[in-house]
Amino acid sequence: MATNYIFVTGGVVSSLGKGIAAASLAAILEARGLNVTMMKLDPYINVDPGTMSPTQHGEVFVTQDGAETDLDLGHYERFIRTKMTKRNNFTTGKIYSEVLRKERRGDYLGATVQVIPHITNEIKARVIEGAAGHDVAIVEVGGTVGDIESLPFLEALRQLAVQVGREKTIFMHLTLVPYIPTAGEVKTKPTQHSVKELLSIGIQPDVLICRSDRMVPPNERAKIALFCNVPEKAVISLKDVDSIYRIPALLQSQGLDDLICQRFRLACKEADLSEWEQVLYRQANPTGDVTIGMVGKYVELPDAYKSVNEALKHAGLTNRLNVHIKYIDSQDVETKGIDVLKGVDGILVPGGFGYRGVEGKILTAQYARENNIPYLGICLGMQVAFIEYARHVAGLTQANSSEFDKNCPQPVVGLITEWQDADGSVEQRSENSDLGGTMRLGAQQCHLIEGSKARELYGKETIEERHRHRYEVNNTLLPQIEAAGLKVTGLSADKKLVEIIEVPNHPWFVACQFHPEFTSTPRDGHPLFAGFVKAAKENQKK
């Protein structure tokens, strides 16, 4: 069966939740037995978000095959079972770099290279490639209609709709329908103007998703339908909700999935949303509360740790607990002392880059170790725990990472210069390598040691988790630290790289070099996060 396409755009303002709405629709279609994939087209000129500031762009989501992508792909994987790959996200920068590479190679046979047709053709080719083999591909265009940056993407999708046939495509437009308290009513004019903007570039939306803080009344939906050339049943109200996992049921209750299946002439079963009902039931009926202190460098923007935040919530669902996250700036630990860490049931130190705030993270690991506070370290969170143990238990008082001190006499953490990627190919790096796209990335196998907490939590010997780092434990100094008691409980497939460490004689102190948050979902959770939150709850009783 040829792929059907749903193109998702946004209007009026940014941050309307296109990714969540698109992922929720994908979840309903998947629940109807359809094979669904999703794509995000980002109109910025960076080749990928890998070198962008987390406080500007939010987290970088790493796919199984090692692509550094937009955080919306994390939403996609949390809502549907399909795993995202490098084909599911591309940027203006990636498109232009590929077109320029082809031009230098002579692929265009001396033609004048232009936005139309060369850039738009490259966009279309990538969308078709990413959608291949699926019943439905939902393609989200980043930004807001009217922005100059997104014009090539919109033109490419307009052309693609003509080429594959309008009966195989749906344009779904998210727009804001604000409520004006002084007037006591919602206003439809912003939506009308947004649709007018879309029409000016040749796109007639088929479905309108109306974002508001309340349900849009039927008379206002009828008005929107009339003035935007859309059937009334295709004007969907999407109000603010207390949980994003309510949105699939909210969209289904208004018949959005039926409308789409009818348009595409898809004969499929009714959606079974029972798994999502279970998620909502557990969320609404917690048996207790737990507070996790997250000590990071980018805490002013919680989206910098989006997948970690969600993974903690998923662990709360698994344990029937309401998880409260207390964000603590690691620099505050340096300047104000360990008092800022008090009052939490567990401590999580997530990933990060650069020296700023690192000593605060090391102090945090020491506080958790010495006070028997459950600790989960991720990526840099493992490295600081390793440095702390080396300094204060193993007697390597000058221990540090070469990332923070290139002349460190005891570099217990150093640059990885060679490793195997997920395909078995050997990757090599040096200190002079580019920052972008040069880390150990994507899913890697990890061997768990018998009798370890990690082995107990996962329940198997070999796991696969996603990585994003260029520094690792220095094996030269590792024997001294192991002799002081630290347990290495997870190793890379070739047994050369340390993946998990555990502190002995501690209720729960586990740190991993990989990023378990990227594989946590609301329906399945993740064993490390579930075990950590459970240990934090048990810590309350002491």
From Swiss-Prot:
Give UniProt keywords alphabetically.
ATP-binding, Glutamine amidotransferase, Ligase, Magnesium, Metal-binding, Nucleotide-binding, Pyrimidine biosynthesis
| Annotated residues for binding of UTP | S14, K187, T188, K189, P190, T191, Q192, K223
Give the top-level enzyme category. ligase
Any one cellular component term from GO for this entry?
Answer: cytosol
**Quaternary organization:** Homotetramer.
Protein family according to the UniProt entry: Belongs to the CTP synthase family.
Protein's name according to its UniProt entry: CTP synthase
**Provenance organism:** Mannheimia succiniciproducens (strain KCTC 0769BP / MBEL55E)
The taxonomy runs: Bacteria, Pseudomonadati, Pseudomonadota, Gammaproteobacteria, Pasteurellales
Q: Which gene encodes it?
A: pyrG
